[in-house]
């Protein structure tokens, strides 16, 4: 939010920029709660897209989109699974390899059969 203000002493006008705080707690699998971390979200996407032809700008856009979607929920808590589902949805349309990398950690593939099954569902 951009605001024009005036100094009470000298009457000089100046501009301030304010950002709305976004307090969101993430409910983990074990029911622990921790504050939402944009950096943690971004790092998980960076890891999945490593050595892929994906610009940091695209990664930032995905993070921005997901964060905005979470803000639009107007809720103070969200399950980590719902955040992971959003990441997977974005990666699936962006880059299949990045999607599989993320899915292998997120869905906790136990063996090659789990990976093969996920690949089959992508076709």
Where are these regions (language model features)?
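Basic nucleic-acid-binding interfaces
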Residues: 12, 27, 38-59, 63-64
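Conserved phosphate/pyrophosphate-binding and hydrolysis machinery centered on Walker-type P-loop NTPases
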Residues: 34-35, 56-59, 73-81, 105-109
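Short metal-coordination and nucleic-acid-contact micro-motifs, chiefly zinc-binding Cys/His arrays
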Residues: 1-6
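Short metal-binding segments enriched for Cys and/or His
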Residues: 8-25
């Amino acid at each position: 939010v951009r605001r024009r203000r005036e100094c009470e002493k000298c009457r000089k006008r100046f501009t301030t920029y304010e950002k709305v705080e976004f307090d969101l707690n993430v409910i983990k699998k074990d029911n622990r709660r921790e504050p939402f971390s944009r950096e943690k979200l971004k790092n998980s996407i960076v890891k999945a897209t490593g050595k892929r032809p994906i610009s940091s700008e695209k990664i930032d856009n995905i993070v921005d989109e997901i964060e905005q979607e979470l803000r639009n929920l107007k809720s103070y808590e969200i399950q980590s699974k719902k955040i992971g589902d959003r990441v997977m949805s974005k990666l699936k349309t962006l880059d299949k390899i990045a999607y599989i990398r993320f899915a292998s950690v997120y869905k906790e593939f136990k063996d090659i059969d789990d990976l093969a099954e996920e690949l089959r569902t992508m076709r």
